Amino acid sequence: MTVPRSTLRLQFHRGFTFDDAAKHVEYFAALGISHVYASPITTAEPGSMHGYDTVDYTQVSAECGGEAGLKRLVDKLRAHDMGLIIDTVPNHMGVGGSSNAWWLDILEWGRHSAYARHFDVDWHSPDPALRGKVLLPTLGASYGEELAAGRIALHFAADLGRFYIGYGPHVFPVCPTDYASILQSADRSDLNALAERFHGLTTQPTDHPRAAEGRDMLREFVAQNGGTAIEFALETYSSGDPVTRDRLHRLIERQHFRLAWWRTASDEVNWRRFFDISTLAGVRVERPEVFEAVHALPFRLYQEGVVDGLRIDHVDGLAEPREYCQRLRQRLTELRDTAPYVVVEKILGRGEPLRDDWPVDGTTGYDFMNDVGALLHDPAGAEPLAQTWAELTGRSPRFADEALAARRKILAENLSAELDRAARALHRIARDSLSTRDFTFTTLRRVLTELVVHFPVYRIYPQNGLRSTADNVYFEQALEGARRSLARADHVALERVNAWLGGSAEEAPAGRGGVPQQQSPNGAPPSHAGSARRTAQTLFSQLTAPVAAKAVEDTACYRYGRLLSRNEVGADPGEFSLSVEQFHASNLERSQRFPHAMLATATHDHKRGEDVRARIAVLSEIAQDWSATLRAWSTLNAPHRRALDSKPVSSVGQDTSYDWAPGPAAEAMLYQTLVGCWPPDLQPDDEAGVKELAERVAQWQLKALREAKLQTNWLAPDEAYEAACREFLFDILAPQRRDGFLKELSAFVARIGRAGALNSLQQTVLRLASPGIPDLYQGTELWDFSLVDPDNRRPVDFAKREAWLAQTPPSEFLSSWHDGRVKLAVVQRVLALRAHLPELLSHSEYLPLAVRGKHASNVIAFARRHGNAWAVVVASRLAAGLLGEKGDLPMVDPEKWENTAVEMPPDLSARALFDWLSPAAPKVDENGLLYLRDALGAMPIAVLVEDGVPRS
């Protein structure tokens, strides 16, 4: 297996192509990267900036450079001994435009499309209006309104010989069985003759070739005679006249789709979406033919040696993640002699392990991002900050309360259709037994709701219809929550649902007196019973996962603001901090179970850049100070609040009412965000710089307000409230405030900036030296003060980074830490060590090291050992109090460490060590102690190796 030493995540799109990346390969190599880790490379919706809306799995994106461009990039990578890992998206496809041939085919032919089973469509909807149809919630207003306004119209694509319903940029193919009536409507002999080609046509697959021949004739007819005749036919379906509009409506009603207002999606959509996004349709990759079709391109590229590994997007969306990973591993292994490198995007809950029976190399690193992020937080700040949040906002101090409320809201308002579908699956099971046939759909829906809202992780992974012991750990928690919430009368149904969802083996349905009912002749349960249970289990799992993502990450994390540095993808804001011992335990477990898992601290999906989080984490160390600052700023900026509903604006700083904009919660979160993302070198009198920052923060603010779904949301935006929030932001950052709030904000950031930078360097070295494969998100080798997308996907100035790359020890840049070169140097130096001694930081033992002395709690240390080679990593932590008010460097004055020392392994007591990051060569004394005043005398972090290892 080609195991990466380190990866660099690059976001490809038409503004940054494969050829653009190829220009910087020399820089990537010099930085120490072994593999470029590419965003999805398959053809996506036109203009896609992320690639996760695939429309053609078989082609490399032409906008990104096509297959030729990809191979040029790979040739450049190979010339520098580098490889390529690609992101694959097997869970869903983009269906929001007119570029997805598979999707257009099912709209054209319905259940008889060759791709009808490629997508997760419920063709047997209980709604007669949707039976055999696909709901298309794409209209900007009600269907009747859009039809009357003429925005829905019949069109003809001359180059394809196809009739279609057009709506804006959308194309909805008309079934060829209707072509004859359309052509005959013009009452022209030439069109009547063409109509004969379509008479008697059915939707059966055997008739599809005949339809294709008819379309060819239509295309030839128009090419030879022009489009005038077809225009006559189209006029008979014009929306401008009531009669022809009714004909158009009846034509649309006969199609295999139902056009609907976009607001209907949450309640009525009859196909699986990616989360609640109605432009992304779930793909049934569990079907062998779909699996092969989806992976044909990556399999070929892997077999050809173009690609070295795969990242699997949203593995929890799949029907069978375990089986998928097993099949993927088997197929890749068949294609090449070397073992493939495969990682999965899997969000792990608190204490949840990645399953051992998944043949993958690990996760994409959100679990490490959570661990190292929590390590930066002082547990002493948890309660006072929660209390401050509750007092200022009137909201709960517990994240769990916000998460539970958000789960209920998401189920009721965003994923109601998905909940109904899962409940119907349970209801079908209930109807198969005399003992459960009286469980109503409403009862089962109520029971299912409580299980889902209390489910603590993304999902379960049943095997052969039964949950595993690991599954039961989390299912029991959901059961307990459901029992507390449900009326006792529903507990019987709850226990049966528990059994159906994998809690017990299948039993023959029992009738009165325990006599089995509805058995086959050999006494077994009905043959469909097992299938029905597995369907219900799949639908349950494909419901809990999006509910967790949308409710926790995309709702509660925007409502709860104790400290925003913990509100991150893959994190639990209720888990405020992690001890050194817990961090070591996680590293040890990873080194033993998934030593090649990715280690991330920034991603294309993060809510705040890694250095934003590192700076905000400092507030946990100064909780009382921050609480006072929040109150002071709230009072200072009270005059800039905006009135809502003509009510007077409070001038009181601590006003927990929500009659004003932005409101207490949004205001408190805004201050944290400004503190976190304020650039280190930005001055309050820099009008252009402050305005640029304000625009970026305003973009974040709008998204945050809508995601919170409190006073505005994506479904029904309150534009007046949003505008008032924006005005408040620009008012408090206006140039005339440079001697007021702006000055205070800048001064506060300057006061905690060194501690934030120290946290950043600690986080950086831990990612680079911990067990696993360090992943670098594009551009974050310098300070990363980005916010949520699209801010974290801005163009990267690689030329600047390349110009700043040097062989100079990081300690030389510490005095100018504001520009970020010290971070760049740390990344380069530690990755160079990985290149010099690849086994030492990848396949080695992980040994936590004890620290003693006055400030032992302010240090983390561990050793990596491979054979006779050693590396010792030491880093300052929770150092805001030790830094003090004086000084310019993000490091503790060496003398302040006093008697604090690392207890070194006996094997290192007599060896000469030097710091890989500075000229220092600290000594281990005769008692095996390494004093921090020596180890951290030049930098807040150290990577100690034996003398004799080349420094460059």
Regions found by a protein language model. Name each.
Residues 20, 26, 38, 82, ...:
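Activation on extended, non-transmembrane soluble regions of large proteins
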Residues 1-46, 58, 63, 71, ...:
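Carbohydrate-interacting/catalytic domains
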Residues 73-121:
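Hydrophobic or amphipathic alpha-helical targeting/insertion segments
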Residues 456:
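Acidic/aromatic/glycine-rich contiguous surface patches that form carbohydrate-binding/processing clefts
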Residues 91, 312-318, 815:
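Conserved short loop/turn motifs at secondary-structure junctions
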Residues 48-61, 99, 103:
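Surface-exposed, active-site-proximal loop segments in enzymatic domains
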Residues 306-312:
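Active-site groove signature of glycoside hydrolases
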